[in-house]
Amino acid sequence: MTFNHFDFEYIDAHTHFFPPQIFNAIWKYFEQTDEKGNIRGWPINYKLAPEDLVQFLKSQNVKAYTTYNYAHKEGVAEFINEWVKDFCIKHKNAIPFGCVWPEDQNRLEYV
């Protein structure tokens, strides 16, 4: 019996979703180049806006997906968590992840 990718439905447990401005900052960071022009981090294969990423996942038979995110510096976790909350209200198949920056003074309030 032969199967193909579209014979199945998937849960993607490792998808990153961030507010667009944070996505852009992360992509810029990971694609920094050295003095020879080589990428020091790694290339980002799917540079898609959150709504486009949702559509791409749907096109691949992904029925549920995480918002696997992280705070990369002080003071952004609360903003990311609020964005994720709103995103998941709109996208019922999204499995929300929250994040925390250990040194945020208000971390207990936003967790």
Predicted regions and their residues:
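Helix-coil boundary/capping segments in enzymes
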Residues: 1-111
